[in-house]
């Protein structure tokens, strides 16, 4: 049995995918690597097929028409057979030593008959252009080195999140969650790091810097120019997240999970309002009104909580342009703090 299914969605990734895949191959026969060619127009598919020839027992290749990052993850999950499931973007990579420790930990848990539903590990923001890094860890938020439940997860502050880069889901639990990501949409990692969580009842935090998240390409979705341009896609993601669970469902979750799910929603709602208000147009104003209306019509209790008792409540009281200015300054500060900008 493969311990981890790594899914690597690729679109025109010829320049950097080899570093990513080579870092995963260090785990050997304990893993499978599913390379998803998402309609690339360069030699991504050729590179993927070469890897499959050279490592036939480890590499799988899916060739599909372009459907966006979410569709690549969906396709990979459909083919995955490993005990755990992990998405690795094609311009990112995993640390060999830390990955070996994770594999060893998984084996130990299997031997003891107590495999957790989700592994959490640190990730590293890498910005090679300025030779700088920033490690995102969870040492103050949860116990390390043992299996625990959500009741032991402490409150997260605003800038701290369990992003997709940190999470290794048990595959059967991920499937059970019914998570299917929208196609042709950026920022779907927000959904992926939110919707499956209630199905993950037992957790294990491995305090190792496993995932290296590359920052610096001009076409990246976190680039502020792209954020402003792609606000409608972030709004779609926010709709998916608010549709996933009602406020009543969230309230009934275990304390630590309930607190984190709410924190997650608050943060992504702030991001959504920022994406929208970072520029002005009549269309943007109407789109934001439509988003709030959608949330209100589906779940009035969740609407009231988000609109009037969340991180976004104060910015929503400000005039549009001032709101956009304040939130942009906040985003740029956060970027500087974690080396995004």
Give the role of each language-model region:
Residues 16-18, 42-51, 93, 97:
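Acidic helix N-cap motif at the loop->helix transition within catalytic regions
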Residues 64-80:
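Glycine-rich, basic loop-to-helix element that forms the pyrophosphate-binding segment
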Residues 69, 92-204, 213-227:
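Donor-binding/catalytic cores of nucleotide-activated saccharide
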Residues 85:
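Short aromatic/hydrophobic "clamp" motif used to bind/position activated sugar donors
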Residues 277-341:
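Membrane-interface aromatic/basic loop that binds lipid-linked glycans or pyrophosphate carriers
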